Amino acid sequence: MKNKIYLIVSILFLSVTAISAQTDEEKQKLSIFSEYVKAKNYNAAYAPWMELRLASPRINKAIYVYGERILNDTIANSEGEEKIKYILDLLKLWEERRTVFPNITPQGAYLAKASQLKYDNQKLLGESKEDLYTAFDAAYITDAKTFTNPKSLYTYFSLMVGLYDSSLKSAQELFSKYDDISEKIDFEVKNYTNKRNAFLGEDGEVLELSRKDTSRLKSYNSYLRAYNQIAGSIDTKLGSR
């Protein structure tokens, strides 16, 4: 009986030791690739990042935040089949993020990012205009609230115009989508204007802000400039149709 108890205790001790050692190793890999990413040494970051991504996908959101930066850099410095491989892996990474961290991965935002990535590489990936529009449309229908990227909203409407010009969409569908996107832009302009104004005084002067709030204000102003630009671009794109 004593021997059995000793054996059980020994097994438990070895298991805990192994888990602890594994956790320490994972933390070390996380620290290593994180520091490489911060230094923008993406080539060095790739191997430890990929090892940890495959072994422990739930350990930390940095796998997905920094992983996106790593793959974007790899895509930018690749060509042909190799570039396609990394593009597809980035799309896969976003899917994994939605599975592992759904609460911090808004569907509309990430489906739009995936659609934009496909659009930006449509020739390389062999994507048709119809398939691209369907992808953007699915993102918008699924979660319009977080589909806020100005560039993607413009791309979405631009694809609709292209399909209309190819007689694949009706005039009613075109103008309905124009109204839809225009209303979305108006809503987001009001949204970001309110966010920006929270950092301004009564006379419009910028209040004394923390570094974090200064960064937020810069982001809000950037969004407002982008929305103003695409609002005009959408009108131009529609033209006399």
Predicted feature locations:
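Preference for long, solvent-exposed alpha-helical segments and helix-linker "stalks"
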Residues: 22-241
